[in-house]
């Protein structure tokens, strides 16, 4: 899966999506229910870095595959919609 630009994009999308799940369902409850705001600081920073990396991998895939602009635009929009990258991944799986 990591041998193609689309495979790398799908993998990065999954990792970035999982970091959002960890942020929402583990770090946020730790902050508000257990009084540990550092959890959100750490996980939020990691998620932000992964988000930027996802956008870089999207740009790499766009120029490597030379696919239509709609795929790049959809990936960019999906990056800003919570859990949108999981829906985008379904489309990428069918794109191959």
Swiss-Prot record:
Its main location: membrane. The keyword Transmembrane applies. It holds the Pfam family DUF3817. GO terms for cellular component: plasma membrane. It is found in: Cell membrane. InterPro entries: DUF3817_TM (IPR023845). It is a multi-pass membrane protein. PANTHER family: MEMBRANE PROTEIN, MEMBRANE PROTEIN-RELATED. This is Uncharacterized membrane protein YdzA. It comes from Bacillus subtilis (strain 168). The lineage of its organism: Bacteria, Bacillati, Bacillota, Bacilli, Bacillales.
